[in-house]
Amino acid sequence: MPKAPKQQPPEPEWIGDGESTSPSDKVVKKGKKDKKIKKTFFEELAVEDKQAGEEEKVLKEKEQQQQQQQQQQKKKRDTRKGRRKKDVDDDGEEKELMERLKKLSVPTSDEEDEVPAPKPRGGKKTKGGNVFAALIQDQSEEEEEEEKHPPKPAKPEKNRINKAVSEEQQPALKGKKGKEEKSKGKAKPQNKFAALDNEEEDKEEEIIKEKEPPKQGKEKAKKAEQGSEEEGEGEEEEEEGGESKADDPYAHLSKKEKKKLKKQMEYERQVASLKAANAAENDFSVSQAEMSSRQAMLENASDIKLEKFSISAHGKELFVNADLYIVAGRRYGLVGPNGKGKTTLLKHIANRALSIPPNIDVLLCEQEVVADETPAVQAVLRADTKRLKLLEEERRLQGQLEQGDDTAAERLEKVYEELRATGAAAAEAKARRILAGLGFDPEMQNRPTQKFSGGWRMRVSLARALFMEPTLLMLDEPTNHLDLNAVIWLNNYLQGWRKTLLIVSHDQGFLDDVCTDIIHLDAQRLHYYRGNYMTFKKMYQQKQKELLKQYEKQEKKLKELKAGGKSTKQAEKQTKEALTRKQQKCRRKNQDEESQEAPELLKRPKEYTVRFTFPDPPPLSPPVLGLHGVTFGYQGQKPLFKNLDFGIDMDSRICIVGPNGVGKSTLLLLLTGKLTPTHGEMRKNHRLKIGFFNQQYAEQLRMEETPTEYLQRGFNLPYQDARKCLGRFGLESHAHTIQICKLSGGQKARVVFAELACREPDVLILDEPTNNLDIESIDALGEAINEYKGAVIVVSHDARLITETNCQLWVVEEQSVSQIDGDFEDYKREVLEALGEVMVSRPRE
């Protein structure tokens, strides 16, 4: 606070009271007048016949001056430390000071005549003591107490340096309160930065303890010296009017405080570098809006409500201010183009990188079970750890009862009740039912997991997840590792799922049957639609039409403004202002809260379109392809087929179905000539060209080449024609010149489809072609098959592809191939009945 100018100094209260001045003036007062007053004061003290009334008056005035001096010194000390006291003359402190002075004060006697000489400027304290010496000692102790318990400022400091210093002083606290706060802070460090903070505080406290002088010695001398120096320089600071302090933000800091500030800034730099290193090591970054008080109250709710979260991967933003809403008991399908972050979102939910309510147990089925000696059924049962603990306790208590310990009977009864409540008796039957539905026969259910392939171990993992029934079950492409029969069972089983479900799938038929809601990932946001995938598709198409109309209307308005003489910038600004007014009007009408996001000009809605095309073949006389009297079996195994006899024409549309392991893929290899029959022969037209899509398609690609180079080398195509062919099958232009080994599974599949088209086949033989394709690409494949004039033989677990292409169903069973009478719904019913399941007929929403 600036002081009055030197020309009109405030008159000190002690001027003119030479007769009643106290000895404290020798220590506290300043200037040449001080010395004169001190001299007069000693002369007055020498008079031994002082009246008793004058002595009492001196004591009263002495107490008043002490209070004034205390206030002045405290104010200077607060100014020096960057503090501001809201109420300097606190009533409680005054009473305490008065009581202390009364205790310390002594009547006029010989002791008072032994007043020590004033302290020299060097700060060396002379021996002896009186009322004022005791007061100075108390003041130094109060300063120590204030350093231990700094008073809370009434108003926050504007200078951030002061704030940093006050924060830096906290680790040096040595009082009871400081110890309690320190112990609380050390109890549970949240992360490595918090632990580093605690370590830094400990180091600072040790440094301060080492450098701290004795309380009764150097510290008091130092403080007295600082006080006298500041008082001596006070008049010069008044002349400057506080300008130097305003210019220099560090002017009010002592050397000790500057040293602490330097240490604090160095610590902050270390923390910042650690955070930067941590961010560089992690590929993903997540941010989320702070939860409101209402959301915090609903932490135990069964629903999930996450607002304004963002996720980026490898520097690419996947979600920006997106909202996630999941209602308990509903079954959600998460859809969107490949590579936009669907799987990433599931992993962040499972890892609780997002704020999921703690009472919701989350399970993401993504890893296959460990390959060991554990039978498949036991691997499923062991997932329920609670049941295992209860069974172990049951055995222990039964052993105690057999030994005559009757005290275990009561606890054993409670264990039985818990086992009944969890359905422990039916646990094994439930596990075997799930395994059977996923394609495990009784012998396979008891087979050790180490004897299964990766795909079958993935099925065991899926069975464990279904057996556990978590509050929120998340499945990422669950049908990829399943055959058609297992997909039919899983589809039917999940329609009766009573808990919350979140599925990522490219199987439109699966989403139509299972899901009650669709979450669409589009433009880094999540959009919600009630109903199954078919309902979503209709609503989304309508929404895109409306957006296109609004965009065209906006472009028309911009064109009119430009024609009227407005620049492009001015026209866009005026259009944005009109959008803002319209947005505010809608908010007032709907009584919505104001959005902080400024309206942006509409962009043309992007239609994600993929179109597959296969060139039409020339006509060939039937039969173009067939197996006659074929028997085949792998060496050392029983035959898969016996006496196969059938032919295929140019207009054939055949889907081969059956459980895994019966030989569907083997049958396709026999038709392509890649396998030679044990008996019989494969016959084909001599002009026939076969296009074969193998589900192990990566083996036929040259990984070191780019897609463009691969097609150019194989078919002698010009550069532009090769790129056009890749573009027709939905491969992005930037991927045309990237090495095939760096492409995703879906991108590699598109390269193989482009290669098939370049071969101009007469017959398409496709083994699980929908793996790694998104829904739009599967639709495009179905349309291409329908338009294709040649024969098509497909093995697929995608029900919609089968039904959309009107394929005849040929089932492989009992070493033979036979055609099914009826459609796909009849086949589904037949599969479920064979498993002892009842077909669920869910009404479409």
From Swiss-Prot:
Residues 304-548, 625-840 form the ABC transporter domain. GO terms for cellular component: cytoplasm; cytosol; membrane; nuclear envelope; nucleoplasm. Isoform 2 interacts (via N-terminus) with EIF2S1; the interaction is independent of its phosphorylated status. Isoform 2 associates (via both ABC transporter domains) with the ribosomes. It comes from Homo sapiens (Human). This is ATP-binding cassette sub-family F member 1. Residues 47-64, 147-160, 206-226, 559-580 have a biased composition (Basic and acidic residues). Belongs to the ABC transporter superfamily. ABCF family. EF3 subfamily. Changing Q695E: Does not inhibit ribosome binding. GO terms for biological process: inflammatory response; positive regulation of translation; translation; translational initiation. Isoform 2 is required for efficient Cap- and IRES-mediated mRNA translation initiation. Isoform 2 is not involved in the ribosome biogenesis. Ubiquitous. It comes from the Eukaryota. ATP 1 binds at G336, P337, N338, G339, K340, G341, K342, T343. Residues 29-39, 73-85 have a biased composition (Basic residues). The gene is ABCF1. Pfam families: ABC_tran. Residues 227-241 have a biased composition (Acidic residues). Induction: By TNF in cultured synoviocytes. GO terms for molecular function: ATP binding; ATP hydrolysis activity; ribosome binding; RNA binding; translation activator activity; translation factor activity, RNA binding. Changing G745D: Does not inhibit ribosome binding. Isoform 2 is phosphorylated at phosphoserine and phosphothreonine. Isoform 2 phosphorylation on Ser-109 and Ser-140 by CK2 inhibits association of EIF2 with ribosomes. PANTHER family: ATP-BINDING CASSETTE SUB-FAMILY F MEMBER 1, ATP-BINDING TRANSPORT PROTEIN-RELATED.
